[in-house]
Design a protein with these regions (language model features):
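Helix-adjacent hinge/juxtasegments
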Residues: 55, 60-73
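HotDog/MaoC-like acyl-thioester-processing domains
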Residues: 1-5, 61, 67, 77-135
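Generic secretory/membrane-interface signal
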Residues: 7-9, 16, 50-51, 73, ...
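Short, positively charged
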Residues: 43, 49-50, 68-72, 88-90
Length: 135
């Protein structure tokens, strides 16, 4: 992963079982994706005038996380197709290096004016998949 960000598990992220709730992982993925995009000068609602919408989420839980722990979240972009790609994540507890989860978010690019899926913008390909740019 070429990009990493840190997020702390809050007490409000803890469920009745005493560990981080599964729904929190989706929120952490969203925040990490937002930070990744901002790091590259992008916004989820404006990549060459197109928005990003979520097509799917997959999470594989590896261990529990607890209030106060700091998670290091690695983010990368992979598996491009005509209309989108996958964001992949690895969540590890910073102090111990314990893996907490692996995840992916499938996204597609969307024109909110025409309400239609669009091809991956060239500028996004240039940043993350230069080998896929058509001449």
């Amino acid at each position: 992963f070429s990009f990493h960000t840190e997020l702390q598990v809050r007490i409000t992220d803890i469920n009745y079982a005493g560990h981080m709730g599964n729904d929190t992982v989706v929120s952490l993925m969203h925040e990490a994706r937002y930070r990744f995009m901002a790091h590259h000068g992008l916004e989820e609602l404006n990549v060459e005038g197109l928005g990003v919408i979520i097509a799917d989420n997959v999470i594989v839980y590896k261990s529990e996380a607890f209030a106060g722990e700091v998670l290091m979240i690695g983010v990368a972009v992979t598996d491009f197709n005509k209309y989108g790609c996958d964001f992949v994540y690895q969540l590890t507890e910073k102090a111990s290096g314990r893996e907490v989860a692996r995840a992916k978010t499938g996204i597609v690019f969307f024109n909110y004016q025409t309400r239609a899926v669009q091809k991956v913008p060239q500028s996004f390909l240039t940043l993350f998949a230069p080998e896929r740019i058509s001449s």
